[in-house]
Amino acid sequence: MTAIERFLSTCTTPEIAVSLLGKQLRLQTSSGVLTAWITETEAYLGARDAGAHAYQNHQTPRNHALWQSAGTIYIYQMRAWCLLNIVTQAAGTPECVLIRGIEPDAGLERMQQQRPVPIANLTNGPGKLMQALGLDKTLNGQALQPATLSLDLSHYRQPEQVVATPRIGIVNKGEWTTAPLRYFVAGNPFVSKISRRTIDHEHHGWMTR
């Protein structure tokens, strides 16, 4: 079992979604390495979760990656956007975490070339970050690995405060509509659907001590 598999499979999916905040996402490309700090996540709890693609164990070719082992990449397309998820549990348990926001680190210029918008709107959403990273569905079903896309667990930042809210866009799903399964770094500017007044412009919500 790899370090990433151990990290992902030793806790519940909501716990993993919180633990991923501040971890470094690392993408190896032909033109260099892009890295970013994860700022926003959502947990999806598989067969019991009415907001999940795997609700009631609904399995299709589109969501097959969800049934693979922890650390598998699950990418699906919603309208024009591709969205990045990481499978969190053992094979056969189709739970995952959606990466909703990242704070650019290495390779900011490249990200801005791939998504030419003001930096405030660069990676503060699940589709936006995929465009900035230049990712499509090619990695769907593959394992996180240093040669392509990985989590660098040795490099991380500690959030000062984590906020939990209902997930975005989950409507008419009973208790799952209001379940607090979305998590983000309070004060970070690279988070979707936040008030600009709440931004910590000095430290971006990360602990400095």
Swiss-Prot record:
CDD domains: AAG
UniProt keyword DNA repair, yes or no: yes
Keywords for the protein's UniProt record, in alphabetical order: DNA damage, DNA repair, Hydrolase
Enzyme class: hydrolase
Pfam families: Pur_DNA_glyco
A biological process term (GO) from this entry: base-excision repair
Gene Ontology molecular function terms on file: alkylbase DNA N-glycosylase activity; DNA binding
Keyword Nucleotide-binding: no
Alphabetical list of SUPFAM superfamilies matching this protein: FMT C-terminal domain-like
EC numbers: 3.2.2.-
Family: Belongs to the DNA glycosylase MPG family.
HAMAP family named in the record: 3MGH (MF_00527)
Name the record gives this protein: Putative 3-methyladenine DNA glycosylase
